[in-house]
Amino acid sequence: MLDVNFFDSIQIGLASPERIRQWSRGEVKKPETINYRTLRPERDGLFCERIFGPTRDWECHCGKYKRVRYKGIVCDRCGVEVTRAKVRRERMGHIELAAPVSHIWYFKGIPSRMGLILDISPRALEKVLYFAAYIVTDPGDTPLMEKQLLTENEYREYREKYGDAFKAGMGAEAVKVLLEKLDLDKMAEELRHEVRTVSGQRKIRATRRLEVVEAFRKSGNRPEWMILEVIPVIPPDLRPMVQLDGGRFATSDLNDLYRRVINRNNRLKRLLDLGAPDIIVRNEKRMLQEAVDALIDNGRRGRPVTGPGNRPLKSLSDMLKGKQGRFRQNLLGKRVDYSGRSVIVVGPHLKLHQCGLPKEMALELFKPFVMKKLVNDGHAHNIKSAKRMVERMRPEVWDVLEEVIREHPVLLNRAPTLHRLGIQAFEPVLVEGRAIQIHPLVCTAYNADFDGDQMAVHVPLSAEAQAEARILMLAAHNILNPKDGQPVITPSKDMLLGSYYLTLPKPDSEPKMRFSHPHEALLAYQNGLVELHDWVEIRFPEPPKDLEPYSEEWWEHPDNWNTVSGKRIKTTIGRMIFNEVLHPKLRYINETIEKKWMGKIIDMAYRKLGTVKTAEQTDKIKDLGFRFATQSGATIAISDIKVPGDKDEILRQAEKEVDQVERNYRRGLITNDERYQRVIAIWSEAKEKVTSTLVKTMEDFNPVNMMMKSGARGNISQITQLAGMRGLMADPSGKIVELPVKANFREGLTVLEYFLSTHGTRKGLADTSLRTADSGYLTRRLVDVAQDVIVREDDCGTTAGITWTEEVDQFGNVIEPITPHIVGRVALNDIVHPETGEIIVYANEMIDEDLAEQILAAGIKEVTIRSVLTCRTRYGVCRACYGRNLATGRLVDVGEAVGIIAAQSIGEPGTQLTMRTFHTGGVAGDDITQGLPRVEELFEARKPKGQAIIAELDGEVSITEQKGRREITITSEDGESVTYSIPYGARVKVRSGQFVEAGDELTEGSVNPHDLLRVKGLRGVQRYLLREVQKVYNLQGVDINDKHIEIMVRQMLRKVKVEDPGDTDLLPGGFVDIFDFEDENERVIMEGGVPAVARPMLLGITKASLATDSFLSAASFQETTRVLTDAAIKGKRDPLLGLKENVIIGKLIPAGTGMGRYRNIKLFTEDDVYAEHLQGADD
């Protein structure tokens, strides 16, 4: 068997009849499967042991040879080879057909390959193949044309008229004759000439035909192989037949389909031997053709063949297609051994790198390790008795288990795994009970809660896998979120509430007492002299003088209070206690700790202390937070929800105003639309007033207020609904109902108010489930389009980059600073201080936060950085163009699968995006798509709803109106002008006399990215897509780094469309990879020919995924049969560069530690090294 790691590429093509016979171990002649009495396979049937191998290991059919010593002998009685039974998964058979039949993929696919190469319409071809018409194969010297169709009557007439002077036939035989006669080289030449000379539909048709002809020419496939003479029979264990209890059999649908083919084939042979009348033979041939069609792709033509209960049978094509097909079910995702799942509960006592594993589960997962150790330690004599000990759970087993799991990490995974933080490694700690315990701080990454969530455990087995889990995947090493580089293990909920309560001061500002040392203050607190929240003054100590300042010991000394050492500070007892658990480098934070501050602390810790210490630091804050959340006794009682006193007054005022508006409307002073808008505005304002009085009246130590202000749970709008008023509600279509809900939940709603608010609730629930599905599908497409983007080299040497400029509004306020766009990126050129002339950042140096600050301080408004959009690496990107790896904060390593990370970073927050489409109200009823559908629209490069008109050249605008139609004319400086007519109801964004640039929007709406590509070129459309996607995410408060979106945009713009092939081998109208296009042109120019001309194309992510070089990746994505048909005809070779292809064939992925450059590193465990060392000493 060929080792999977030793081949570089995999090729697919058409199989010739000889090839199929070569694969086969014998012909299946009978439709029988197994004998109903003996339950052994019938000879020459679909499960025949002589063809496919024995059903039991080392045993022939008749039982003459049993046992392994007869290995390889072929039994002289029954003809079965004595070998392993698993050959029944590998050996194929074949069926010799009495008449050739066509392969439905090549005849029925769109476009029909057979029809194109013969230049016959698919409908005419269908008539011939299914015996409804004759086709002339050789007109001889008659006036008939080759490939002319004749009806039954016409055929008879011409036969009587011309006798045997012409040849005509029907069915696949006739088509085969035509296919064998084709001269591909000559056809290719004629078609190339035709493409150059004709235009319109004929040109398109010729181009399509040329593509198919070229495919056959280059691949070495023969066109007549599209007609089958022999049919391969797949191995029986891949279409099994199993006995159910009750003596009935369950069988794979393929057996039924094969059986029909064999029955019809045998009947046809018999009829031919008998010399039956032509009409009967013809009918039988047609039925054979239909049976083979059903076997290959049931339901592609006509009604599908159904089994019991009217269920269509699953054909060979269905076995590959869809989520349950071979690709997605068995090749891309397999079930694995050494895994288990259980409910999760919180483990607040755990360290960040630990998880609690139930004893029983651990024993089962680590069984082989435990058994080996039991034998090695002499507790058991052999593996069998060790196994018995484990099964009986003897006491010594538990001690051995403790030893085995020490230092052996396990992987925990929670479905759905939306990003790479959904699988992390932990050191197991054995716990009683049957629930897995997880650390509270990793819940954010897993998006886990404890309302019954389950998680799966996997055990990495090999030394390499363990090393990877420990070094790369340990939870304590995954502190930053790859999507934005922010810490993902920030303490929240109870921990945050505890820290907030602890650091919250009393409203009075005078210090209650003064202390000479923190310990003294602590003593006073413990003796009840001061409270946690009292303002006090404390003098903080300094680290001992004998320690060298800024040395490791100096920093680690508990008396080092950093910024406040040796000073007297006004603070609270609680804040002092909080700072005590902080590392000296982070002190002293004299603030009330809420969500933002907590994030800042973790961020500072990561930058100043590194990974390991940050993990320790978060654990300390976690413990402190839990302790004081408990101590605070913060609960919600109904008395904590206080309704503001002047609510009634505000409502009365609002009602008065609404009455006034209604009166104005009845008098005809305002339109209904204005009345509606006014009423909505009045109630919104009333609600805001209630909210602001509510905020003023709430006390600092009110638990509801503490939860909200700390950011632990709830927001101001929820509290307004509890204690203020619920306000306006939307109806099912999203329109706001002008009747507000005046009550709050504390007072209780009336029946009508309750009913009004149910609309919104239902919409919310429906939206959530729809959103989850859509978001998952979007992620799948993103992963597919970018899965082969891997960091392949250090520097691609490009001279291009993208320039970010600070954006300011007309008053000089900065709308968009450049800092977020340039941090973590590599500078293209030296960045020089405009006044002093010193170089702040050298070319090819990464810009970190400090350098970005310096750039900002120097007043530099424009920076050019390296970007993946301009990267010149062929099958991926280079380190310099990608910049910082956000999960580590350092420059990305070669081998990082940045495409997948980008897809996850965009897809994971997708569930948070809304589904709603906004209503602008009034006449302009064009909904502006927002939220998730907008992201999808952008990535799929669709024509947007509510499309804006864009300027096609730079120039001055003039707006004219005639007969109620508005027109915008743009006149450029050289006198050229373009006029656009504005559709009714569109809102114009420009004024007469204004100067616009090409690509600017003239009316409101979304721009069609294809138009933008035409007008502004690559750079313009890249900018636009990046901006628009960011806009949607920013609206929801989701922060995603530019580089992730850039990777997607780069993949969408990888192809060019050939306009004129010149002297190249490229096909006109074909899509080619930019790099292949450049190579081909370079080759032609070197030979002195005319290069090809092409224009860049923007493909949606689905199209781009299917247009990849890898047919395995494309076939496993969507439209499996179409992709495989195309690949087979072209004889495509898959270079196995991406991740999916390698997973499918079972190789290590070419990313991370699976890259070629890391292949020859071998890992040793300490014991191995120690043993070798001892051996060396003995020698």
Swiss-Prot record:
UniProt cross-references to InterPro entries, sorted A to Z: DNA-dir_RpoC_beta_prime, DNA-dir_RpoC_beta_prime_bact, RNA_pol_asu, RNA_pol_N, RNA_pol_Rpb1_1, RNA_pol_Rpb1_3, RNA_pol_Rpb1_3_sf, RNA_pol_Rpb1_4
Residues holding Zn(2+) 1: C60, C62, C75, C78
Annotated binding of Mg(2+), by residue: D449, D451, D453
GO MF annotation terms: DNA binding; DNA-directed RNA polymerase activity; magnesium ion binding; zinc ion binding
GO biological process, one term: DNA-templated transcription
Pfam families: RNA_pol_Rpb1_1, RNA_pol_Rpb1_2, RNA_pol_Rpb1_3, RNA_pol_Rpb1_4, RNA_pol_Rpb1_5
Cofactor(s) recorded in Swiss-Prot or TrEMBL: Mg(2+); Zn(2+)
GO CC, alphabetical: DNA-directed RNA polymerase complex
Top-level taxonomic group: Bacteria
Enzyme Commission number(s): 2.7.7.6
Annotated positions binding Zn(2+) 2: C796, C871, C878, C881
Entry keyword set: DNA-directed RNA polymerase, Magnesium, Metal-binding, Nucleotidyltransferase, Transcription, Transferase, Zinc
Cofactor note: Binds 1 Mg(2+) ion per subunit. Binds 2 Zn(2+) ions per subunit.
Coiled-coil region list: none
Catalyzed reactions: RNA(n) + a ribonucleoside 5'-triphosphate = RNA(n+1) + diphosphate
Quaternary structure and partners: The RNAP catalytic core consists of 2 alpha, 1 beta, 1 beta' and 1 omega subunit. When a sigma factor is associated with the core the holoenzyme is formed, which can initiate transcription.
Annotated function: DNA-dependent RNA polymerase catalyzes the transcription of DNA into RNA using the four ribonucleoside triphosphates as substrates.
HAMAP family in UniProt: RNApol_bact_RpoC
Family: Belongs to the RNA polymerase beta' chain family.
Designated name of the protein: DNA-directed RNA polymerase subunit beta'
Organism name: Symbiobacterium thermophilum (strain DSM 24528 / JCM 14929 / IAM 14863 / T)
Lineage of producing organism: Bacteria, Bacillati, Bacillota, Clostridia, Eubacteriales
Gene from which this protein is expressed: rpoC
